[in-house]
């Protein structure tokens, strides 16, 4: 992740004092002697050119103020920067401290290294900006098999006797515990060789340590591949627990000289069923693998193979899992269906019965909670339980009095099934059905999607992986945001082309958008400026269009832009092709509000040259005079004003619906449904519309597209309403549409109970 970094002084100024400079880097500079990169720093003779220190191993809560309080005790601090993540602004655990002179930096490195800050010892070293010097492995020493009690300071004190240390670090896990290995970066290669010569094989805290030159990961990988090809250590599992160490060694001695053989045992001394054998030559190990793999020893078939390290096994298992996952995904591509909106009483068998007619089902599963659902007890259910208990007591007495034969196997199986069903958790309302072929799956989607099952319409679609669903969701959210922006622009009172301000284009330049332009009237035309519209070079219309200097307005045969359909021609014709001051807002008002849309002059906009007062309808039109009714000009009779036409009910799309706010979605659906329902039931159209609006928005969109389904829903709502009226009586007519809705809910509840 990206981070902000304050770097070291770059160069000396005239007075010889280095200047602190700031820069940005994408990651923490690896100046530590770590496994992934092996930095090098110049010797002390070159250090006066830099007075910047790297401070690592910091607690995430450490701030610049805390560091300033500590490092200012040494000398005057030029700047301090704690490096943070560019997005979350959380500390990355390291910082840079820039002093005004190098002597203060040297004193801070000597006195403050491994000082406790917020309970954690900090690690200080000279900062090195040159990555080429940081990543050379010269002088870097690797130490393993360290005792857990050895920390950075103890390691530094141990190896400081062999030369000047630039960096020293013990690797730790996420909990701060030592991983048992570390790195010491010396100033010179001679010091590193001296440390390896004297410390390798010695005891540190009663543990024999290995000390050697650090090998980069790339070189280690090539060496590791060579070791894999010439292995001598083999792993054996599925060993019979009765096999002893002597028997185990004797089984594998026939293939060559064994340097070591061991059986793994638990703390109680019992065999854990696996062991290791190490041969002196690769040929012997390979022969043992070839001969003993899958061979039975004391009725146990052995597994014999090359011994692997833990990280190697984990990587291999990860690859196997990924390959199996991809194979499974390709195998079930187009045949696995996702079904939701299931009622609680639908189980695996019921789901299989529903989709069985469409093909061969390989699996059907209803997803359930991990724990059984607790039934809510009502007074009625408590009474039923008491009655059931009394009946059970009577039955037990009768069974005790009469000797009955043992239950048959079938009865036991039935009871087992019932007990299993009781242990099942509550249904999550969705499941999966897998067919044997894609054709059967597509047929099931076509037939079963939106089908009513137990009073609820099913949603059936092809199952998708989580990452695919996430990408589709992100795309839909982005499209929804785009629609919202377009609707907000339309609400400002301008067609889309005029929503974009005028853009200036210099020779060979992309142009700029003037700041402060809000929705409404466009900029007055100026030389070198064209009106902004989508497509090609933004804001350019083909041919002379209003807004170009010296133009005469729109020609009589010129095609109008898409969003100008419905605007009176007089509103776009005036001297110089400039939209008239009053005609243009009135035309916009007619487009948005239909009759009476004329709004007059925009408040606060002065009447400039080329703009006319009320009633002006283009070049040569009358000025002044009474305005006709409805706010239209005198040309309105000759040219019918294109008011906003009623959109057909079926024009409502899911994309437009999702772009609206949740409270407005039901209103939009109601406005689209009402005309269709009114055509079928003029008297009860309002009540039926209100009843249908209780359904999900996706189902309502489906009804708008399917007249047969809508007719069936209207008939169903009528039957519910008629039943409600019969129960209430003709004299108690409902006062509003809420009562039939309640009746519909009561009827649905009774149907579910039955």
Curated annotation (Swiss-Prot):
InterPro entries: Nucleotide-bd_a/b_plait_sf (IPR012677), PABP-dom (IPR036053), PABP_1234 (IPR006515), PABP_HYD_C (IPR002004), PABP_RRM1 (IPR034364), RBD_domain_sf (IPR035979), RRM2_I_PABPs (IPR045305), RRM_dom (IPR000504). Residues 1-52, 365-420, 595-648, 729-754 are annotated as: Disordered. It comes from the Eukaryota. SUPFAM superfamilies: PABC (PABP) domain, RNA-binding domain, RBD. Residues 1-25 have a biased composition (Polar residues). Pfam families: MLLE (PF00658), RRM_1 (PF00076). One of its GO terms (molecular function) is RNA binding. Its main location: cytoplasm. PANTHER family: RNA BINDING PROTEIN. This is Polyadenylate-binding protein, cytoplasmic and nuclear. It comes from Aspergillus clavatus (strain ATCC 1007 / CBS 513.65 / DSM 816 / NCTC 3887 / NRRL 1 / QM 1276 / 107). The gene is pab1.
């Amino acid at each position: 992740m990206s981070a902000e970094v304050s770097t070291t002084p770059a160069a000396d100024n005239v007075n010889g004092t280095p200047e602190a400079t700031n820069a940005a880097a994408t990651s923490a500079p690896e100046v530590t002697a770590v496994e992934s990169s092996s930095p090098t720093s110049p010797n002390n003779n070159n250090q006066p050119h830099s007075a910047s220190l790297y401070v690592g191993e910091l607690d995430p809560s450490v701030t610049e103020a805390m560091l300033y309080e500590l490092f200012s005790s040494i000398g005057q601090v030029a700047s301090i920067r704690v490096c943070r993540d560019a997005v979350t602004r959380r500390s990355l655990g390291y910082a840079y401290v820039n002093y005004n002179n190098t002597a203060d930096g040297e004193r801070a490195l000597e006195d403050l290294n491994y000082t406790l800050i917020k309970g954690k010892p900090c690690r200080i070293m000279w900062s090195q900006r040159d990555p080429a010097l940081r990543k050379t492995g010269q002088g870097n020493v690797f130490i393993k098999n360290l005792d857990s009690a050895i920390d950075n300071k103890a390691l530094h004190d141990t190896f400081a006797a062999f030369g000047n240390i630039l960096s020293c670090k013990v690797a730790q896990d996420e909990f701060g515990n030592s991983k048992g290995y570390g790195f010491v970066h010396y100033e010179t290669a001679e010091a590193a060789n001296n440390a390896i010569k004297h410390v390798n094989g010695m005891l540190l805290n009663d543990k024999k340590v290995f000390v050697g030159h650090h090998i980069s990961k790339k070189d280690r990988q090539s060496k590791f591949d060579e070791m894999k090809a010439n292995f001598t250590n083999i792993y054996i599992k599925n060993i019979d627990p009765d096999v002893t160490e002597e028997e185990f060694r004797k089984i594998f001695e026939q293939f060559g000289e064994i340097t070591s053989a061991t059986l793994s045992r638990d703390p109680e001394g019992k065999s854990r069923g696996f062991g290791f054998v190490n041969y002196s030559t690769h040929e012997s190990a390979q022969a043992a693998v070839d001969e003993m793999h899958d061979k039975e020893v004391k009725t146990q078939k052995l597994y014999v193979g090359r011994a692997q390290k833990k990280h190697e096994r984990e990587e291999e298992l990860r690859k196997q899992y990924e390959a199996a996952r991809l194979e499974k995904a390709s195998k079930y591509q187009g045949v696995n269906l996702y079904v939701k909106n299931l009622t609680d009483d639908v189980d695996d068998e019921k789901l299989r019965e529903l989709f069985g007619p469409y093909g061969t089902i390989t699996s059907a599963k209803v997803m359930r909670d991990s724990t059984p659902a607790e039934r809510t007890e009502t007074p009625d259910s408590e009474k039923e339980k008491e009655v059931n208990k009394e009946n059970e007591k009577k039955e037990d007495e009768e069974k005790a009095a009469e000797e009955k034969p043992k239950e048959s196997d079938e009865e036991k199986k039935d009871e087992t099934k019932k007990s299993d069903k009781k242990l099942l958790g509550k249904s999550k309302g969705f499941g999966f059905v897998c067919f044997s072929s894609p054709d059967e799956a597509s047929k099931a989607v076509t037939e079963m999607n939106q089908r009513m099952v137990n009073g609820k319409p099913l949603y059936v679609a092809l199952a998708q992986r989580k990452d695919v669903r996430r990408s589709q969701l992100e795309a839909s959210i982005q499209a929804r945001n785009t629609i919202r922006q377009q609707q907000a622009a339309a609400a400002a009172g301008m067609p889309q082309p005029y929503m974009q301000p005028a853009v200036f284009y210099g020779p060979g330049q992309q142009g700029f958008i003037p700041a402060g332009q809000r929705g409404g009237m466009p900029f007055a035309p100026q030389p070198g400026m064209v009106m902004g519209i989508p497509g090609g070079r933004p804001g350019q219309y083909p041919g002379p269009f209003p807004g170009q200097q010296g133009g005469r307005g729109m020609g009589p045969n010129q095609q109008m832009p898409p969003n100008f359909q419905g605007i009176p021609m007089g509103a776009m014709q005036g001297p110089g092709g400039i939209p008239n001051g009053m005609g243009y807002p009135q035309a916009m008002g007619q487009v948005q509000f239909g009759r009476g849309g004329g709004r007059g002059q925009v408040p606060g906009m002065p009447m400039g040259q080329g703009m006319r007062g009320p009633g002006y309808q283009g070049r040569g039109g009358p000025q002044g005079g009474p305005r006709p009714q409805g706010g239209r000009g005198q040309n309105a009779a000759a040219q019918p004003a294109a008011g906003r036409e009623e959109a057909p009910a079926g024009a409502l799309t899911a994309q437009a619906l999702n772009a609206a706010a949740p409270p407005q979605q039901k209103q939009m659906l109601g406005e689209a449904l009402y005309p269709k329902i009114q055509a079928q039931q003029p008297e009860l159209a309002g009540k039926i519309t209100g009843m249908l609006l209780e359904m999900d928005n996706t189902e309502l969109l489906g009804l708008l597209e399917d007249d047969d389904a809508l007719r069936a829903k209207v008939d169903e709502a009528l039957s519910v309403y008629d039943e409600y009226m019969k129960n209430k009586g003709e004299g108690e007519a409902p006062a509003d549409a809420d009562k039939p809705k309640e009746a519909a809910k009561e009827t649905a509840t009774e149907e579910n109970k039955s």
